[in-house]
Protein backbone atom coordinates (compact mmCIF):
# COMPACT_ATOMS: atom_id res chain seq x y z
CA UNK A 1 0.00 0.00 0.00
CA UNK A 2 1.00 3.59 -0.60
CA UNK A 3 1.49 5.75 2.50
CA UNK A 4 0.97 9.52 2.72
CA UNK A 5 1.38 11.80 5.72
CA UNK A 6 -0.71 14.78 6.78
CA UNK A 7 0.96 17.99 7.93
CA UNK A 8 -0.14 17.20 11.48
CA UNK A 9 1.52 13.77 11.31
CA UNK A 10 4.75 15.30 9.99
CA UNK A 11 4.79 17.85 12.82
CA UNK A 12 4.05 15.21 15.47
CA UNK A 13 6.79 12.97 13.99
CA UNK A 14 9.37 15.74 14.48
CA UNK A 15 8.49 15.88 18.18
CA UNK A 16 9.30 12.18 18.74
CA UNK A 17 12.60 11.03 20.21
CA UNK A 18 15.01 9.03 18.05
CA UNK A 19 13.97 5.86 19.88
CA UNK A 20 10.29 6.61 19.27
CA UNK A 21 10.99 7.31 15.59
CA UNK A 22 12.70 3.91 15.29
CA UNK A 23 9.61 2.25 16.78
CA UNK A 24 7.45 4.34 14.45
CA UNK A 25 9.40 3.25 11.37
CA UNK A 26 8.96 -0.40 12.36
CA UNK A 27 5.22 0.11 12.89
CA UNK A 28 4.93 1.86 9.52
CA UNK A 29 6.69 -1.03 7.75
CA UNK A 30 4.27 -3.45 9.39
CA UNK A 31 1.29 -1.24 8.52
CA UNK A 32 2.33 -1.01 4.87
CA UNK A 33 2.68 -4.80 4.73
CA UNK A 34 -0.55 -5.68 6.53
CA UNK A 35 -3.00 -3.33 8.26
CA UNK A 36 -4.04 -6.27 10.44
CA UNK A 37 -0.47 -7.06 11.55
CA UNK A 38 -1.00 -8.44 15.10
CA UNK A 39 1.50 -6.22 16.94
CA UNK A 40 -0.24 -3.09 15.65
CA UNK A 41 -3.58 -4.04 17.16
CA UNK A 42 -5.19 -1.80 14.54
CA UNK A 43 -8.87 -1.07 14.96
CA UNK A 44 -11.42 1.53 13.94
CA UNK A 45 -11.77 4.31 16.48
CA UNK A 46 -15.06 4.53 18.32
CA UNK A 47 -17.22 7.41 17.21
CA UNK A 48 -15.52 7.73 13.84
CA UNK A 49 -16.39 6.18 10.55
CA UNK A 50 -13.06 6.14 8.73
CA UNK A 51 -10.31 6.70 11.30
CA UNK A 52 -8.21 3.81 12.59
CA UNK A 53 -5.76 3.64 15.48
CA UNK A 54 -2.68 1.43 15.76
CA UNK A 55 -0.18 0.69 18.49
CA UNK A 56 3.38 1.86 17.90
CA UNK A 57 4.56 0.94 21.40
CA UNK A 58 3.09 0.57 24.84
CA UNK A 59 2.69 4.34 25.15
CA UNK A 60 2.58 5.51 21.52
CA UNK A 61 -0.32 5.39 19.08
CA UNK A 62 -0.85 6.51 15.53
CA UNK A 63 -4.06 7.25 13.68
CA UNK A 64 -4.72 6.78 9.99
CA UNK A 65 -7.35 6.45 7.29
CA UNK A 66 -7.52 4.03 4.39
CA UNK A 67 -8.56 5.44 1.02
CA UNK A 68 -8.43 2.81 -1.70
CA UNK A 69 -4.84 1.59 -1.85
CA UNK A 70 -3.50 4.50 0.24
CA UNK A 71 -2.93 4.79 3.98
CA UNK A 72 -3.21 8.41 5.13
CA UNK A 73 -1.27 8.91 8.36
CA UNK A 74 -3.09 11.47 10.53
CA UNK A 75 -1.32 11.67 13.90
CA UNK A 76 1.28 9.96 16.09
CA UNK A 77 2.24 10.43 19.72
CA UNK A 78 1.34 9.64 23.31
CA UNK A 79 -1.68 7.38 23.70
CA UNK A 80 -4.22 9.78 25.22
CA UNK A 81 -3.11 12.91 23.36
CA UNK A 82 -3.15 11.20 19.99
CA UNK A 83 -6.50 9.51 20.43
CA UNK A 84 -8.12 12.73 21.65
CA UNK A 85 -7.15 14.44 18.37
CA UNK A 86 -7.04 11.69 15.76
Named regions from a protein language model:
Residues 2-11, 18-22, 55-86:
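Enriched for short, Lys/Arg-rich terminal
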Residues 1, 13-15, 32-34:
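Short hydrophobic/aromatic-rich motifs at helix boundaries and adjacent loops
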Residues 17-21, 45-48:
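Short, structured coil/loop segments at alpha-helix boundaries
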Residues 29-54, 83:
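A short, surface-exposed loop/turn module that caps and links secondary-structure elements
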Amino acid sequence: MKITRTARFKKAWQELTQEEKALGRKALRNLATDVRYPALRAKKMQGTEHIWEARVSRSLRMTFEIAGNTIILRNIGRHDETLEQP
